[in-house]
Amino acid sequence: MVATPSATTGLQVAQDYVIADINQAEFGRKELDIAETEMPGLMALREKYGTEKPLKGARIAGSLHMTIQTACLIETLVELGAEVRWASCNIFSTQDHAAAAMAARDIPVFAVKGETLEEYWEYTHRILEWGDGGSPNMILDDGGDATGLVMLGSKAEQDITVLDNPGNEEETFLFASIKKKLAQDPTFYSRTKAQIQGVTEETTTGVARLYKMQKSGELPFPAINVNDSVTKSKFDNLYGCRESLVDSIKRATDVMVAGKQALVMGYGDVGKGSAQSLRGLGATVCIAEVDPICALQAAMEGYRVVRLEDVVEDMDIFVTATGNYQVIRNEHLLKMKDEAIVCNIGHFDNEIDVASLKDYEWENIKPQVDHITLPSGNRIILLAEGRLVNLGCATGHPSFVMSNSFTNQVLAQIELFTKGNEYGKEVYVLPKHLDEMVARLHLDRIGAKLTELSKDQADYINVPVEGPFKPDHYRY
């Protein structure tokens, strides 16, 4: 496919992809070749299902960070028979060479690092539009934006007033993009929704949206909660963040973490990994939590459990990892010390009240790193404009841990596409034996050797010799 520069943006635009620079495709392919050696789960699925092609006929609309690791996921889906259209789920998370590598294979991808919010929603629409006028029949989501777009658009077809009062800048662009689409095609969203056989969701915040729809009876198709597979949440969320958080802070600021005081807000799996990473480089780490169980866990690990308002003037580094909104508000930002570093590793950009800083003086240091001068004269360093710091200021999680997550995604897509009529309009998790299979596929790469139960031992603890080894309620 031939790409030509847009006269208005300079981006590479073709009939069926929008990327920054097709000339980066060779670089992307070289990095993808390395990533494949670190993604044994995906490679095993290609070998197992490549001939069978269980996803033949699947049209997957993918909304997930367009990274090198995601490129490996995309190529696995294609190898298994799927047609794929892809956009990033964050305006800063795209790796342009990864997007170029996909475009060079004629895989429709719409993702540019640093795209505007207007472009973001335009690109998310593009993954729902098949060239033959058809629709996707599967969604692979991260954060729920693709699913949410279909659902909100369907509501707007019936009542356009749902788009009247945007609550923030992002909703302003989202609502405008839906109105624009409805003017072109008044039944686009309901037709698309009717074709969807299922959705697989990658992350905590997107899963919360699905459960909310299920509770209200609005979920129109089955969904698989990939996030709560043990081999996703206990690995990607924990060990991935343990490596990628400090990587992003160091790349963005070059500061010495040792000796700094850091506050991690939220002590779920992401917060646990984040706290470990900062402590590992010598920071004194405190935790802010609302959940008494998580707070007790943090205390038992030796962290001080504090309230933000009690320590805000003392901290050097602030990390939000809650999945909630307005966690760090303007009154907190105004009290921060000079050169405090503020960042977010939760999925959405509303954990930090960045909008309240817009009236202050901003100095851009480099992409996704801004100095903001407060009324007190102190300057804070805001990373990635409050969006995902590990993908905005670095390259996200390492390939190996993402292989765990993405192997779950492929299995979930196969499950819903081939057996969708066996599922109701509810949110499901993958069965335990598949979770254990994902783990098993990754052991050899790191030299781990499993001990095997004898028949007598298996009978004694009442499990099959080959597993599953734990009941569904086991917490790991």
From Swiss-Prot:
GO BP field: L-homocysteine biosynthetic process; one-carbon metabolic process; S-adenosylmethionine cycle
Its job: May play a key role in the regulation of the intracellular concentration of adenosylhomocysteine.
Binding-site residues, substrate: T67, D142, E202, K232, D236
Family per similarity comment: Belongs to the adenosylhomocysteinase family.
Residues that, per the record, bind NAD(+): 203-205, 237, 266-271, 289, 324, 345-347, 390
Originating gene: ahcY
Main subcellular location: cytoplasm
Name of protein: Adenosylhomocysteinase
Cofactor: NAD(+)
HAMAP family reported for this sequence: AdoHcyase
Keyword set includes Transport: no
Source species of the chain: Synechococcus sp. (strain WH7803)
Catalytic activity of the protein: S-adenosyl-L-homocysteine + H2O = L-homocysteine + adenosine
E.C. code: 3.13.2.1
Cofactor binding remark: Binds 1 NAD(+) per subunit.
CDD domains: SAHH
NCBIfam families, per database record: ahcY (TIGR00936), PRK05476.2-3 (NF004005)
Pathway assigned in UniProt: Amino-acid biosynthesis; L-homocysteine biosynthesis; L-homocysteine from S-adenosyl-L-homocysteine: step 1/1
GO molecular function: adenosylhomocysteinase activity
Keywords: Cytoplasm, Hydrolase, NAD, One-carbon metabolism
Pfam families found in the cross-reference section: AdoHcyase (PF05221), AdoHcyase_NAD (PF00670)
Gene Ontology CC entries for this record: cytosol
Compartments where found: Cytoplasm
Superkingdom of origin: Bacteria
